[in-house]
A protein has these predicted regions:
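Bacterial N-terminal signal peptides
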Residues: 13-23
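Aromatic (tryptophan-biased) beta-strands that constitute blades/sheets of beta-rich domains
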Residues: 30-93, 100-103, 120-127, 158-180, ...
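Repeat-blade elements of multi-bladed beta-propeller folds
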Residues: 31-35, 85-111, 125-152, 178-212, ...
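Conserved class I S-adenosyl-L-methionine
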Residues: 453-475, 481-485
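Conserved SAM-binding strand-loop segment of SAM-dependent methyltransferases
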Residues: 505-518
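A short acidic, Gly/Pro-enriched loop at the edge of an enzyme's catalytic core
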Residues: 518-530
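A short glycine-rich, Lys/Arg-flanked "PGG" loop and its adjoining helix->strand segment in the class I
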Residues: 538-550
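Conserved beta-strand signature within the Rossmann-like core of class I S-adenosyl-L-methionine
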Residues: 549-557
Length: 1015
């Protein structure tokens, strides 16, 4: 909404500069690429004149953006409003306009060309995946990239393919943002310049990311550059002799246009928006809506100012922020060293501005409900044009203004005096032939066996796309809630895609993949929940199906559950196992490969600084703790299966607490302590099966575990867990000597009824973070001193706890005390932990030693508490403000790792990697906050990015250009590694913020060598 006032700040002859600026733009009156030109200025010399009227509207389907919304704020930065999305270029189709045509791509795999004057479809062409960035028109051709990993040139006249090239390696497809995609998707807008098409391929450096130059005439590769640890996302920008390559949510990079050589990072605001005009560059929008301006040369001064969008002519910048649109005199701004304060010519208040462009003598501003036309020289409003949904993108030429809306509509406005035209035709869905659509034999039974709601289905049924096949596809689409992939021959692909698109299914619920005769389907293993196949494809169906219980194959009409993966690890408790080992038994041998990415994003997740409960994983299910509930995700393809609300369930500062969630080993049941009730949830459907009240009046459930098929729990004061959020509280919990959460009783809930089989109260306190179980025994530290006995808060410091404490072993069957040993441990000032594995009990503690954390580890026999060995170490990182003093050990079959030290489990002697001459310690190669997890052959942790450390050779492998959570969220489970998103509220420059999963054991990703241009 535009408010009815305008502020004219400068009264000098500004319009002369505006006119000169338009003259410099030349007579260009088309919009052939995103934001109008190769510099992404969002300005064109000529636009439609006079009063505009609505001319036509076309429906493109509901957009499906790749990335979720950002977090709802940041405690650490004291930001109490939603963060700005920094990689949101596909919120709706972005149209381009040239030669009387409007062309756009959609997330429904379509490229469509419509007549600019009538909106009538001239042609449409389908890609193998979503088209997330605007096409580019040049020389009578339409150049487009897609998530199928291909760059194509289409004839503007009829949409026929002129050439098609895959710049990245030809690798099996994976699950990406809920779709079947190439592991090397085209996630930058193409730049066409001087007969060259510049493009990127790839999103995850682990799989390889590349910058390429292709000959616009025939698609021949001119040169190729490997980008390293870069995730190219956004529109490529022409910067004269250079290219700006956006890096997703991080800072953009500068590469030489002639050969792709890396020049430097642009020290600008983070995000995918980049604009060049002359020698100046602008970028943003940052996490809080901030644009940065600077000259392109190295070392130039950078100035930041509030803004989310801008349009730039040679003389004027139009800046749009969340409150207003401003016209800035660029020469005055340069004279002021980039400060916009003294360069404002006019400004107009805008509520909810979303897009801004310049077309001729007008500025067009899109908002939630209208497009407003203003005079470029004064800001006076000429006209307001109503629209049905928020404006995402605008484009214009001399005859029309085109607006793309958030609901998928594209609406055009033309001068009122233009010749009347017929409206665009409505998209008609062809009727299905009469008769009830029947699911193929066995599919209904397969769906019952899954009983898990949303998921992925695959049809491998025989060749030929006749009427019967169309009916089968319709039956599968209408008779299940699965997202289906149909494997067809190359000759059938376009027709099947067209059929599915006409029904509104392509993209949103269906994909088509080409299968070559006699070859495996080019798709990663174990990606589909239900596979429909014929007997000749049995082996292929089993390869592609998720392991049981989340996978079913229907072969020749018989539904069979896929076999479970016996090697898959499970993370059923806060620290992995009821024994608190922070480890699983699976292998990480082989090469990590991306299996899926997307899943849930940060918008519902708790602020990372609060260090919430670890996600859990078992039986093909991953459970994440959201701010307001729980989210169940498929571990093999990232599909969000279910989401339930758990009001006031979130606990914070989990290093000082015990786990309050537990997942059954097969993922079929979940138990969650929610205030005074213990909720039992069906893991397949997310439905709440039971709410068990606490058996002791006035108490809440504390620690919850499951060992030997029986639940174990603790009872605490309602105020004991940390549940309040505020900057001051988060800041406190990162300091040293913070209190531990404690319970007043241990108990085993009855299987029937709401009582307890046994209860072991204490006059002092049970320390939640030390409670663990194995082999029919329960272990914990019991504090018995005066301060523990007098406490009524449920929180005590380590010093207060260790005033008089003992390690206690209970019989899990009846709660009897089997043994106890006094615990005197002055070194454990900041944290206490207990873990049990293989008959060994591990006591962990830490203290602040100057600016470093000192770690202390003791190994006792679990049978009687006799001490076997003790070890200690010092964190090499001088930093006590990121939780270094609250780490926990990772207990493995042969080794135990405690942050910087790795020790032999039977002797406590330091472990060294092969070839080490002595003095080795484990130092993470990068930021070292958050805890560690592990398996017998490696450790997982944050080192800036999620990283694998291998015991076999002491090597480090970076998994993804993302930020893990601040406690535990890198899980070695399901045959690989799953990383549910837990970095919500991060404002730093990490390119990707999403959940993801990796498989191990396949061959490493092939790396394409750099190819330099021919001399």
């Amino acid at each position: 909404m535009i408010r009815e006032f305008v502020s004219i700040v400068r009264t000098d002859p500004f319009w002369w500069g505006v006119a000169m600026g338009l003259a410099v733009l030349g007579a260009r009156a088309e919009w052939p690429t995103a934001r109008g030109d190769a510099g992404r200025s969002a300005a064109v010399a000529a636009g439609p004149e006079g009063a505009l009227v609505a001319a036509w509207v076309v429906e493109t389907g509901t957009p499906e953006p790749a990335w979720a919304a950002e977090a709802r704020g940041s405690l650490w930065q004291k930001i109490d409003r939603p963060l700005v999305s920094r990689a949101a270029d596909d919120l709706a189709p972005v149209p381009v306009v040239a030669d009387g045509a409007v062309v756009f791509g959609t997330t429904s795999d379509e490229v469509r060309c419509v007549d600019r004057d009538t909106g009538r479809t001239r042609w449409r062409r389908f890609c193998g995946g979503p088209v997330r960035f605007a096409p580019a028109i040049a020389g009578g051709r339409v150049f487009v990239g897609s998530d199928d990993g291909r760059v194509q040139a289409l004839d503007l006249r009829d949409g026929q393919v002129v050439w098609s090239v895959a710049p990245g390696p030809d690798e099996p497809w994976i699950s990406g943002n809920g779709r079947l995609v190439s592991p090397h998707p085209i996630r930058t807008g193409l730049l066409v310049s001087e007969g060259i098409v510049h493009a990127t391929a790839g999103l995850f450096p682990l799989e390889g990311t590349y910058l390429v130059a292709l000959d616009a005439s025939d698609g021949r590769l001119r040169w190729r550059r490997h980008l390293g640890n870069v995730s190219p996302q956004g529109y490529l920008v022409d910067a004269g002799a250079d290219l700006i390559v956006p890096n997703g949510r991080a800072e953009p990079r500068l590469h030489r246009k002639s050969d792709g050589a890396f020049r430097r990072e642009l020290s600008r605001s983070t995000g995918t928006l980049a604009v060049v005009s002359g020698t100046e560059s602008f970028s943003g929008p940052g996490a809080t809506g901030t644009l940065a301006r600077g000259d392109l040369q190295a070392g130039a001064k950078v100035v930041s100012f509030p803004g989310r969008q801008l349009a730039v002519t040679p003389t004027t910048s139009l800046l749009l922020n969340e409150r207003e649109v401003l016209a800035l005199d660029r020469s005055a701004m340069r004279a002021a060293g980039g400060d916009p304060g003294g360069a404002v010519v006019w400004k107009r208040a805008v509520d909810g501005g979303t897009a801004v462009i310049v077309a001729g003598r007008r500025v067009y501003v899109g908002t939630a409900r209208e497009v407003v036309a203003m005079r470029l020289d004064t800001g006076a409003v000429d006209q307001s044009l109503p629209v049905e949904a928020p404006v995402v993108a605008l484009a214009a030429d001399g005859a029309a203004l085109v607006a793309s809306l958030a609901d998928g509509r594209i609406r055009a406005f033309r001068p009122a005096g233009a010749a009347a035209v017929a409206p665009a035709e409505a998209r008609r869905v062809p009727p299905m032939s009469t008769g009830r659509l029947m699911l193929p034999e066995g599919v209904a039974e397969g769906l019952v066996r899954l009983s898990s709601g949303p998921g992925w289905g695959l049809s491998l049924r025989g060749p030929g796309a006749g009427a019967d096949d169309a009916r089968v596809r319709a039956a599968l689409m209408e008779g299940s809630g699965l997202r289906w992939t149909f494997a067809v021959e190359a000759s059938e692909a376009e027709a099947v895609r067209s059929e599915l698109a006409d029904r509104g299914w392509l993209g949103s619920r269906a994909s088509v993949v080409v299968r070559r005769s006699g070859e495996p389907l080019p798709v990663a293993d174990h990606l589909f929940n239900l596979v429909l196949a014929e007997g000749s494809d049995r082996a292929e169906a089993l390869r592609l199906a998720c392991p049981g219980p989340s996978g079913v194959v229907v072969i020749d009409g018989r539904a069979t559950a896929a076999d479970p993966d016996p090697t898959a690890g499970a993370w059923s408790h806060q620290y992995g196992t009821p024994g608190n080992t922070c480890a699983t038994g699976q292998s990480l041998r082989g090469s990590p490969r991306l299996q899926w990415f997307g899943g849930h994003g940060p918008e519902r997740m708790p602020d990372r600084h609060t260090r919430g409960h670890a996600p859990l994983a078992a039986g093909g299910l991953v459970v994440s703790v959201a701010e307001d509930g729980l989210i169940g995700t498929d571990a093999r393809n990232g599909t969000v299966r279910w989401s339930i609300a758990l009001p006031e369930a979130m606990r914070y500062a989990m290093p000082y607490d015990g786990g309050y969630l537990v997942l059954a080993d097969d993922g079929s049941r979940l138990w969650a302590a929610v205030d005074g009730a213990l909720w039992e949830v069906d893991g397949r459907s997310g439905s709440v099966v039971r709410r068990r009240p606490h058996p002791i009046p006035g108490r809440h459930w504390g620690w919850v575990a499951r060992s030997g098929g029986k639940l174990l729990a603790s009872s605490l004061f309602p105020e004991a867990p940390r549940t309040l959020k505020a900057y001051e509280l988060v800041d406190l919990e990162y300091r040293s000597r913070r209190p531990m959460v404690c319970s007043k009783a241990l108990l085993r809930p009855s299987e029937s009824g709401d009582g307890a089989d046994w209860t072991v109260p204490t006059e002092g306190a049970w320390v939640n973070a030390t409670l663990c179980a194995e082999a029919g025994r329960v272990y914990g530290i019991e504090a018995r001193g005066a301060k523990a006995r007098a406490d009524r808060t449920g929180r005590l410091t380590c010093a207060d706890l260790l005033e008089d404490a003992a390690v206690v072993c209970l019989d899990a069957a009846d709660g009897r005390r089997l043994w106890e040993r006094p615990l005197r441990w002055p070194e454990a000032e900041d944290i206490l932990g207990l873990a049990v594995s293989g008959g060994r009990l591990f006591l962990s503690g830490a203290r602040s030693a100057g600016s470093q954390a000192a770690y202390h580890l003791r190994c006792w026999r679990a049978s009687d508490g006799a001490e076997s060995w003790a070890a200690s170490g010092l964190n090499p990182v001088h930093d006590l403000y990121h939780g270094q003093q609250v780490k926990r050990p990772v207990v493995l079959p042969d080794l135990v790792s405690f942050e910087s030290g790795v020790f032999a489990i039977d002797t406590g002697k330091p472990w060294r990697p092969p070839g080490d001459a002595g003095g080795w310690i484990l130092k993470r190669p990068g930021h070292a906050c958050g805890g560690m997890t592990g398996t017998g052959d490696g450790l997982l942790f944050r080192a800036d990015n999620p990283t694998v450390f291998r015991f076999s050779d002491g090597s480090f492998t970076r998994l993804a250009p993302t930020r893990p959570g601040c406690w535990l969220n890198i899980l070695p489970v399901e045959g690989g590694v799953v990383i549910p998103e837990a970095s919500a509220s991060c404002v730093c420059g990490y390119p990707i913020q999403a959940s993801m999963g990796f498989a191990f054991g396949r061959r490493p990703a092939p790396a394409l060598a750099d190819l330099l241009p021919a001399r």
